[in-house]
C-alpha cells in the first residue's frame, strides 16, 4: 500500500444535521450581523464607486504621512486620505503610499490641475518621490458603475438559480440561492467590518465567489440526486448526509488546491491585487462551508420530490411494481 | 472496456501540440515583440530595413507562430481615458448655421408678416419674433419648407427640424430623430479624429472604442501620463481665418450683427472684433508641418487644398493692407496684416508656442478638428515599473501555487496525481495559447484568474479520481472502475462548469478593462481545464493502462 495523503478518511459518517441549530444558526447570525455592519460602517468604496482620485507614490525615503498631509493642507481638497502601503514584495528602498482625494465639488470631469498641484506639493516634501499610478474617476461614471455592479450580482444570482431550477428542482434552486446570498452578504460584511477598499475588482471577486460556491453546491446536489434515485426509501435527511459524506473528500481536496494557489497569490502577488485576492480567498472558505451547511438545509426544509426514476404519469405502474 | 479511438487520440494530441505551439512565443516575449515590431516597421517602410530592424527580425524564425498575449495597461503601463462627447454643442452650431437661410426665407415674405427679429433663446433653439402675430401660420409654413428628411434608418420619415409657434414667436429646433442622427454622427466623427490623432503620434496598439451612445474609451500603452494624452486629444483644434473688424480691450462692448469678440492668446487684455463667418477653415487644409518663422521662432507651416487656396487668394488680393485673424479654438493666435495677395495656397501660423507646441498643433491640424468638445470622465495612468512589478509578483505567485497544487495532487493520488499534474501544465499552456491566438488582453486580475484556474482545474480530476476510488471499493476490476468513474463524474463536472461559465459571461458584460480581462482568462481556463482534465488525463491514464495491464490499481 503506497503512501497516500488523505485529507479526509476514506469513509466518513458525519451527521451534518446534528448541530444544525448551531451551524445554520451561526450562518443566519453572521448574515444578519453583516447586514448590521454594512449599515453601521458602510463600505469603504474605492474611487470606482464614489469618484475621486488616487495617487500612488513611491520613494526611496521613508513615507511621512504627517508631512504629506501638511503639504496637501493648503490645497483645500476636502477629504484626503493618505495611507502607507506595506508589502513583502517591496525592496528595501521602496516606500509606497496611497493618497486618495474625494471628488471635487461641482466638477463632472476630472481636473488635471488638482492632480498636478498634489504632485507638486508632494515633490516639495520629498524630491525623490515618483507617481507610478494616478487614477481619477468622475462622479458620473462612478454612479453608473454602482448600478452596473448591482445589476451584475443580481443577474448572476438569477441566472444561476434559473439554471439549477432547469437541471434539478425548484427546491434546489432556492437552496443554491440562499447559500449564494449568504456568501455574498458575509463577504461584504467582512469588507465593511475591516474597511477594506471595495471597488470594481471586488465585485469581480464576489461574482467569482458565486461561481466557486455554486460549483461546490452543484457537486453535492448532483450526488444527492443520484442517491435519491438509488435509495428511494431512505429518509431525506439521511440521503443528504450520505451524499455530503461521499463528496466530502472531493470538497476538501478541491478547496485545498484552490486555497493553496490563492494563498500563494495572496502572499506573493503584490499589494495591487491583494484586496481582490483576499475577497476570493475568503469567499472560497465561506462558499465551501455554505455548500455543506447551508444549501442542503434549505432543500431539506422545503422537501423534495423523492421519485426521480419515472415521470409522474407512471405513478400507477410504480405502485404495482413496488407492491410486495 | 477502456478504449479511445485512434482519431480521438490524434485529435487530443494535435490540439495540445497546437495550443502549446501558440503559447510558446510568450516564453520569449521581448524577442518576439522586437521581431513583430521590426516586421511591421519594415512593411510600413515598403520593404527597406535598417540593420537593427534586420537583426530584430532575424531574432525569431518567421515560420513559427508569433502572436503574443497582449498585456493590459495595468501590466504594461500607459494611459486610459474615458471621454464623453458633448453632442449638444453641435445643435447650436447647426441652428446658427440655419439662421441666415431662415432670415432670407422670412425676409422674402416681409410684405405679409412684417419685420422679423431673432430673440434670446436657450442653446440649440432659434426664436424669431415677427411683427404681425396673425400671420404666424404663414411664417411657420415658410420655415417648414426648409426642412429635409432625416438621413438615418430609425428616423426615416421624419424631418430634421421642428417648427412651432406661440403668439408672435416662432421656435425652431432640431427634431428628436435628427438629434439622434446628429449625435451618432458627432460621436463617429470624434472617434475618427481621436484615432487619427493618436495614430499620428505612432504609439503601439492603441485601443480606441466607442462605449455606449456618446462615450469614447481611449487606451494607449507606453504613454507617460494621461495628461499628455489629454493634451493631444482634448483640444478641439478648430482653426478659422476671419476678417478683423476692430480691436479693443473691452470684451463686453457690442460686437454688431454677425460679429464676435474673441481674446488674444498672448495678451489677455486684448480683444478682436471679427466677422463671424470665416473666410477659410481648417477643414480645407491638406497639410501642416512644424517649422520656424523668419525670427527662428517655432511656427506651423500649412497648405490649403485647391478650393481653400482659391478662397484665401481671392480674399487676400481684395483686402491688401487689412488685418485678418488666425483663430484657434476661439482664441486669436495672430492677426497679421495682408501685405500682398497670397495665391500659393500656403501660409504660416506663428505666435507664442514652443517646439513641442508647434509639433502638437501640426498634428492636430493634420488630423482635423473635433466636431464637439470632449469631457473626461475617467482617467488612469499606470507607470511601466508598477506593471513590471505586478508581472514579476504574479509570475512568482503562479509558480509557487502551481508547485503546491502539484505536490498536493501527487501526495493524494500518486501516479494519477502525476497524470493530473501533466494535464494541469498542458492546461496552462493552452490558456496562453488561446489568449495569444485570439489576441486577448492579459490584465492583473487576469493573472489572478489563471492562478484561480490552477487551483480549480484539478477539480474535474478530483471528481473523477474520487469516483474511481469508490468504484474500486465495489471491486469490479480496475478498467471498469476507471470507466465508471468517468461516466458518473460527468454530470457533476458539466453542471459545475456551466454555472461558472455563466458567471464569467456576466463578468465579461459588466467588465471594463481589468475585470474583462479576468472574465476572459477565467472562461478560457474553464474550457481548457475541462478539456485537459477529461481528455488529456484519460488519454494518459489509458495509455499507461494499456502498457502495464495492472491487475489492481491504487488511486
Regions found by a protein language model. Give the residues of each.
Chain A
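A structural signal for conserved, well-ordered secondary-structure elements
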Residues: 1-324
